[in-house]
Amino acid sequence: MAVDVTEYHLSVIKSPPGWEVGVYAAGALALLGIAAVSLWKLWTSGSFPSPSPFPNYDYRYLQQKYGEAYVEAKLKRVPPWNAQRTTTRGPPSRKGSLSIEDTFESISELGPLELMGRELDLAPYGTLRKSQSADSLNSISSVSNTFGQDFTLGQVEVSMDYDGASHTLHVAVLQGKDLLEREEATFESCFMRVSLLPDEQIVGISRIQRNAYSIFFDEKFSVPLDPTALEEKSLRFSVFGIDEDERNVSTGVVELKLSVLDLPLQPFSGWLYLQDQNKAADAVGEILLSLSYLPTAERLTVVVVKAKNLIWTNDKTTADPFVKVYLLQDGRKMSKKKTAVKRDDPNPVFNEAMIFSVPAIVLQDLSLRVTVAESSSDGRGDNVGHVIIGPGASGMGTTHWNQMLATLRRPVSMWHPVRRN
């Protein structure tokens, strides 16, 4: 006897087997259980998320500091270089990698090495190594030392190019701002002197400017210079204030190595940060650092490449150097890493990478303190000197930080003078 297929399907739907009913009921109960557990977790967690993946930054701390709920803080987690756009910009950078989309409001004020955003070639120094230690200082509530900051004495905008046919270096002093801001003296006018080092040959002296704080120099100078001298010479830009007794007082100086500019290939234009000449005399060596920030992973990478011409403490003739890198927030130590010790070497090559987890929302509150120290048998190293890098620093420290933010995902290398502690 033939059975109608349609009637058979209807009979199965109207009167399903008992085991199918059990399967459906178990599935429904499982879904209800999962939904109930999820709702319970959301209710008990309130407005706070699960523990932050960043070891040094908990969003509870962000709420406490900024007085915002986590949701509001999360919505504000946009990189500072995209948060604001300046309405007035200086001369555009000549480096192709510095596009408008990648920069922030200070891009027109990058310092003397704004051309250094190229890839860091570490091949001569061997394989890149991870830092030896990562001593944790991530207790948010802990109070630790507050380190001092360097101070800038204004900025000057300059441009220069080299005429290979006539072997002539052309230098233009365009403008200055925030000049002569010194607490110990008052000046009504100033002028600038450009000299060629190490011979201290005078390239040019500007006219005296009466409005000494934000002024337009618009001065152009030229000096004969052999192409081979570009690898050896430096330019010094010095600002002098004129006091009420008509005395010329040095108020700020900056030196620029011509070897880093590639002037035979392209002109240079940028802002230079002036510093106290007395501070420049406190240098006890130089250190080459590379910085990069990966916004997608919110990761800050510091590479301690090498140091040179280190001067040991207490007139020592030999020492074993190493480098400590502190991540600071509002002057407080949040994390610390250090390199391996190099035995008896005033020109050590470290080539060690240090990685910090840094949310973009706190980038503007951060700075780096890089300390060169001497290892000792008792485990307490004497500090040789330090470098401050960040938005609150000055000179090369600010320049390097700004350049890192302007060329995201790419390492930016720069030499820094090591200041005596």
Swiss-Prot record:
One of its GO terms (biological process) is vesicle-mediated transport. Residues 152-272, 283-416 form the C2 domain. GO terms for cellular component: exocytic vesicle; hippocampal mossy fiber to CA3 synapse; plasma membrane; presynapse; synaptic vesicle; synaptic vesicle membrane. The modification Phosphoserine is found at S97, S99, S214. It is found in: Cytoplasmic vesicle, Secretory vesicle, Synaptic vesicle membrane. Expressed in the brain, specifically in neurons of the cerebellum, cortex, hippocampus, olfactory bulb, brainstem and spinal cord (at protein level). It is a single-pass membrane protein. Its main location: membrane. InterPro entries: C2_dom, C2_domain_sf, Syt12_C2B. Phosphorylation of Ser-97 is required for mossy-fiber long-term potentiation. Disulfide bonds: none annotated. PROSITE patterns: C2. Changing T87A: No effect on phosphorylation by PKA. The chain crosses the membrane at residues 19-39. Keywords: Cytoplasmic vesicle, Membrane, Phosphoprotein, Repeat, Synapse, Transmembrane, Transmembrane helix. The keyword Transmembrane applies. GO terms for molecular function: calcium ion sensor activity; calcium-dependent phospholipid binding; SNARE binding. Residues 40-421 are cytoplasmic. Belongs to the synaptotagmin family. Synaptic vesicle phosphoprotein that enhances spontaneous neurotransmitter release but does not effect induced neurotransmitter release. Unlike other synaptotagmins, it does not bind Ca(2+) or phospholipids. Essential for mossy-fiber long-term potentiation in the hippocampus. Homodimer. Can also form heterodimers. Interacts with SYT1. This is Synaptotagmin-12. It comes from Rattus norvegicus (Rat). The gene is Syt12.
